[in-house]
From Swiss-Prot:
Disulfide bonds join 53-76, 67-73, 72-97, 85-104. PANTHER family: ADAM A DISINTEGRIN AND METALLOPROTEASE DOMAIN, ADAM METALLOPROTEASE. GO terms for molecular function: toxin activity. Transmembrane segments: none annotated. One of its GO terms (biological process) is cell adhesion. It holds the Pfam family Disintegrin. Negative results: does not interact with the collagen-binding alpha-1/beta-1 (ITGA1/ITGB1) and alpha-2/beta-1 (ITGA2/ITGB1) integrins. This is Disintegrin lebein-1-alpha. Residues 47-111 form the Disintegrin domain. Expressed by the venom gland. The keyword GTP-binding does not apply.
Length: 111
């Protein structure tokens, strides 16, 4: 028996943001996106990112997790404020995590 799942994939996992697709159960790497009069094969691993932080249906952090990826995200949690996320090069200064985002904001000051 073939099971059919309706899944919405976000841009972070597959470049068809907000597209509704129909998937047949079986090998994840063999799923296809079905459009009217058109079938497009998903690239290998499109649905199986292997990221334990990511809800594969919503492409958002799983319940209780802060982030999916980023320079200030480790083990699905934001790194502490003040953690170096980008080491200084040349006359630049280090960039630091804020503790409330997975992004690494640029330090506006120079040495």
């Amino acid at each position: 028996m073939i099971q059919v799942l309706l899944v919405t994939i976000c841009l972070a996992v597959f470049p068809y943001q907000g597209s509704s697709i129909i998937l047949e159960s079986g090998n994840v790497n063999d799923y296809e996106i079905v459009y009217p009069k058109k079938v497009t094969v998903l690239p290998t691993g499109a649905m199986n990112s292997g990221n334990p932080c990511c809800d594969p249906v919503t492409c958002k952090p799983r319940r209780g997790e802060h982030c999916v990826s980023g320079p200030c995200c480790r083990n699905c949690k934001f790194l502490n404020a003040g953690t170096i996320c980008n080491r200084a090069r040349g006359d630049d200064m280090n960039d630091y995590c804020t503790g409330i985002s997975s992004d690494c904001p640029r330090n506006p000051y120079k040495d």
